[in-house]
Every structure is written in C-alpha cells, then in structure tokens.
C-alpha cells in the first residue's frame, strides 16, 4: 500500500476537524431551538392569563412570585437572545458546509492525481 502524501493527509485532517466543528454547531443549534420553542410556548401561555394572575419563577430550589409583565419581558428578552444564537449558528453551519465542500473537492483532486500517477507508474513499469 502506498503511503498517503502529507498534503493529502493534511486535507483529510482539516476535513475531519471541520466535520467535528459542524457536528458541534448542529448540536448547539438544536439545543437553542428546543429552548426557543419552550420560551415561545411559555410566552403564549402567559399572554392568555389575566393581568392580575399569580405567576411564579423557578429560582434554584424556590418559586418566587413575579408579575405577569415582568415575566413576559424576561421571556421576550430570552427569546430575542436565543433567536440571535440560532441565527449565528446557522451562519456558522453554512460556512462550515461550504468549507467541507471545498475540502472534499481538494481531497478528490489529490486522490485523482494519486490514482493517475499510480496508473502511469504501472504502465511504465510493465
């Protein structure tokens, strides 16, 4: 078996690293999207409550009373932050996918060179 050239090995290493980064980004994005759905559901439920409804916020091991308006504002702020995180991670995902496509092309070119060189060596050596 022929040894893999350092240039090809470097491309494969970079590809694997980008793939791992993409998996990490996708996992984080999925977590933020799940939390975003929960926040949106909470906002929807609280908006249906009367203005004087008793609302409690979970703080550690305690439930602390909170006004409806304050609870809604905190949830809306959290929603805005989560949407920003999702948007940022979506951009990172897109960039990583482009990077992976380019690396895949480069790897295929290197493999084609190796295959072509091996074919030439076999023809010349026969």
Curated annotation (Swiss-Prot):
Biological process, per Gene Ontology: chaperone-mediated protein complex assembly; protein folding
UniProt keyword list: Chaperone, Cytoplasm
Cytoplasm found in the keyword field: yes
CDD domains according to UniProt: Prefoldin_beta_GimC
Keyword check for Chaperone: yes
Superkingdom of this protein's organism: Archaea
GO molecular function: protein-folding chaperone binding; unfolded protein binding
GO cellular component: cytoplasm; prefoldin complex
UniProt-annotated location(s): Cytoplasm
InterPro entries from the UniProt entry: PFD_beta-like, PfdB, Prefoldin
Family, per entry: Belongs to the prefoldin subunit beta family.
Quaternary structure note: Heterohexamer of two alpha and four beta subunits.
Function: Molecular chaperone capable of stabilizing a range of proteins. Seems to fulfill an ATP-independent, HSP70-like function in archaeal de novo protein folding.
NCBIfam families in UniProt: gimC_beta
Name under which the protein is recorded: Prefoldin subunit beta
Native source species: Pyrobaculum aerophilum (strain ATCC 51768 / DSM 7523 / JCM 9630 / CIP 104966 / NBRC 100827 / IM2)
Gene: pfdB
């Amino acid at each position: 078996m022929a040894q893999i050239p350092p240039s090809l090995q470097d491309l494969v290493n970079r590809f694997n690293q980008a793939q791992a980064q993409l998996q990490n980004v996708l996992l984080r994005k999925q977590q933020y999207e799940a939390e975003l759905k929960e926040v949106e559901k909470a906002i929807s439920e609280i908006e249906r409550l009367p203005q004087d409804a008793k609302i409690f916020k979970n703080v550690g091991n305690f439930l602390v009373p909170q006004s409806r308006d304050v609870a809604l504002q905190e949830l809306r702020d959290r929603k805005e932050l989560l949407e920003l995180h999702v948007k940022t991670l979506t951009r990172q995902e897109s960039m990583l996918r482009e990077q992976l496509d380019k690396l895949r092309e480069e790897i295929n070119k290197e493999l084609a060179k190796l295959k072509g060189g091996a074919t030439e060596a076999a023809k010349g050596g026969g």
